[in-house]
Amino acid sequence: MKATLAAFLIAAGCVLPAPVFAEAGAKAEVKMYATSWCPYCAKARAYFARRGIAYVEVDIEKSREGRAEYDRLGARGIPVILVGPQRMNGFSEARLSQLLADAGY
């Protein structure tokens, strides 16, 4: 019985997918909830462009799913910028620089 169980567990380990771990040194995802007309969103876009930082932008007026995500955050106002688990409401270059530095950017 023990031998059968051991054989099963070994075989199962051969066919089960390996766990996926974050790559060492991988940077946190940067996401911004924004609108096309928001002046602070424009400042954040320019900041990301100047520094060559890749980010995901979600226009909360054009994307239903994006608006639902924004609402689940309990957000008010734009932009809302996420750097991994850290959140910033509005735009402050100093604060965003610190969040990005803490995330390895």
Predicted regions mapped to residue ranges:
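N-terminal signal peptide c-region/cleavage motif recognized by signal peptidases
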Residues: P17-P19
